Structure formats: C-alpha cells, structure tokens
C-alpha cells in the first residue's frame, strides 16, 4: 500500500498580491540568506524560507542568484 504524499507550498503573504509572485520569490530568497547569515547555515528556523523560495522561484533564477552571490555581484541586499 502506498503512503499518501502531502504537497505544500509557500503560504499566502499579504505583502504580495497574487500578481506579484516574482517579487515574492526574490524576497523569500533574500530572507533565507539573511536568516542563515544571522543564525548559521544549520539553523532550523531558516528552513521555512528555503522551502518557500524553492517552491516559488524557477531553478534557473536560483542558480543565477547563487552564482552572483559567489562572485559578489548579487543585486539584492543580503
């Protein structure tokens, strides 16, 4: 017998109406990296932000942003 799989995504955020998911994605990515900077790479509190940005952002964007962070050219405030 197969186990049931429960799918979840980022909860609604009043700061972002449904028409602005690009900004929501970018903000969640920044929140995750700010959290890990403040609390450490293994902080459990930061995992929710990781789940949110991974659910909202296209993989190509995340790859590009990770690359930009490594080279110091990321356009956002971290």
From Swiss-Prot:
Keywords: Disulfide bond, Mitochondrion. GO terms for cellular component: mitochondrion; plasma membrane; respiratory chain complex IV. Its main location: mitochondrion. SUPFAM superfamilies: Cytochrome c oxidase subunit h. A motif (Cx10C motif) lies at residues 46-57. It is found in: Mitochondrion. Residues 22-65 form the CHCH domain. Expressed in the whole plant. Disulfide bonds join 25-57, 35-46. Pfam families: COX6B. A motif (Cx9C motif) lies at residues 25-35. PANTHER family: CYTOCHROME C OXIDASE SUBUNIT 12, MITOCHONDRIAL (PTHR46281:SF8), CYTOCHROME C OXIDASE SUBUNIT 6B (PTHR46281). Belongs to the cytochrome c oxidase subunit 6B (TC 3.D.4.8) family. This protein is one of the nuclear-coded polypeptide chains of cytochrome c oxidase, the terminal oxidase in mitochondrial electron transport. This protein may be one of the heme-binding subunits of the oxidase. This is Cytochrome c oxidase subunit 6b-3.
């Amino acid at each position: 017998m197969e186990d049931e799989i429960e799918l979840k995504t980022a909860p609604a955020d009043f700061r972002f109406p449904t028409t602005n998911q690009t900004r929501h994605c970018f903000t969640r990515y920044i929140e995750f990296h700010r959290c890990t900077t403040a609390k450490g790479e293994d902080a459990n509190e930061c995992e929710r932000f990781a789940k949110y940005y991974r659910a909202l952002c296209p993989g190509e964007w995340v790859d590009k942003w990770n690359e930009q962070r490594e080279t110091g050219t990321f356009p956002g405030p971290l």
